[in-house]
Amino acid sequence: QYVKDPDKQVVARIFLDLQLVQR
């Protein structure tokens, strides 16, 4: 599924990065 939707993978990575920054 991720392979078909690379955009979602990128967004998920950015979202995780934001969470790490908030911590």
UniProtKB/Swiss-Prot annotation:
Q: Which UniProt keywords apply?
A: Cell wall, Secreted
Localization, per the record, is:
Secreted, Cell wall
Protein name per Swiss-Prot or TrEMBL: 48 kDa cell wall protein
Q: Name one GO cellular component term.
A: extracellular region
